[in-house]
């Protein structure tokens, strides 16, 4: 097949899509122009919109001996659609556009984000994912039984690997670097946020595993701005995330945060190397049961 998405459209539970050497880019790649706000929200390169099943994962991986590159300048590299489960992604290089951005461009984008958020005009909105695109992630929808392994993810403006509202996630043997430089969204390199148990399965077993990853040089260089903090943010500083906020408090190497208060699953961190990250190497925040 010519595109990875075509291969995904043909696969069934238990099947594998092999990807050979090459550079795979999103539509309109290379035609972004922040000075005119052109193509600032390009689509993902790869969308996994199917589920496997227990014992029959869908696998998206490199053909043996190959290292295909996913190159994006928009929303992200590989996204797993909401409520798609039993997925394995392995053996890719995923590269974002961070090397094409500088501090002045990112600060100007933060100013624009503030302008459209506070202009009291409902017809304007901020959607510049160019400055916050993720490498491999699950959108902001629920997932369970996902494996992300043996990938190289770098120069993503937002998180390199991220899952929200999920359970049974394994992130192992990835190399992650140069992420989060240019976003004003206070993101981190590898993130498990708002983890929640699969219905009927809220045990204290080890369910969320981050191991064997090399995570380095992931920083926030741009101050955080958001119109409203999440109710479960846990931050009581009235200036945090406002237009006038002058500090940078975020940018972790590995970050677990804001898990569901009733979530009983155990998080395992094992044999990760975290070096030269912005705030912390590993930060376990507003969650329970880590080992």
Task: Locate the predicted segments by residue.
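Extracellular beta-strand-rich solenoid/capping regions of secreted or surface-exposed proteins
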Residues: 2-5, 9-13, 26-59, 68-91, ...
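Short glycine-centered segments of the SAM/dcSAM-binding site in methyltransferase folds
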Residues: 16
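Right-handed parallel beta-helix
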Residues: 20, 57, 61-66, 85-96, ...
């Amino acid at each position: 097949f010519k595109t990875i998405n075509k291969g995904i459209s043909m696969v069934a539970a238990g099947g594998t899509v092999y990807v050979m050497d090459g550079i795979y880019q999103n539509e309109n790649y290379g035609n972004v122009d922040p000075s005119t706000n052109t193509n600032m929200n390009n689509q993902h390169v790869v969308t996994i919109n199917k589920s496997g099943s227990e014992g029959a994962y869908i696998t998206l991986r490199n053909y043996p001996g190959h290292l295909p590159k996913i190159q994006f300048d928009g929303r992200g590299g590989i996204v797993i659609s909401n409520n798609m489960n039993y997925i394995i992604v392995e053996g890719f290089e995923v590269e974002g556009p961070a090397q094409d951005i500088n501090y002045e461009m990112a600060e100007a984008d933060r100013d624009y984000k503030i302008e459209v958020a506070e202009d009291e005009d409902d017809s304007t909105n901020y959607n510049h994912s160019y400055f916050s695109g993720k490498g491999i992630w699950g959108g902001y929808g629920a997932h369970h039984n996902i494996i992300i392994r043996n990938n190289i993810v770098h120069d993503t403006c937002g998180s390199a690997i991220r899952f929200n509202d999920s359970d049974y996630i394994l992130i192992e043997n990835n190399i992650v670097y140069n992420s989060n430089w240019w976003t004003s969204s206070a993101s981190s390199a590898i993130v498990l946020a708002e983890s929640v148990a699969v219905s009927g399965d809220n045990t204290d077993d080890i369910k969320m595993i981050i191991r064997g990853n090399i995570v380095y040089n992931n920083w926030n260089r741009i101050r955080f701005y958001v119109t409203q903090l999440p109710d479960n943010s846990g931050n009581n500083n009235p200036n945090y995330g406002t237009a006038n906020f002058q500090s940078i408090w975020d940018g972790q190497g590995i970050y677990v945060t804001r898990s569901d208060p009733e979530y009983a699953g155990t998080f395992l961190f094992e044999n990760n190397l975290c070096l030269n990250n912005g705030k912390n190497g590993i930060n376990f925040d507003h969650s329970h049961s880590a080992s």
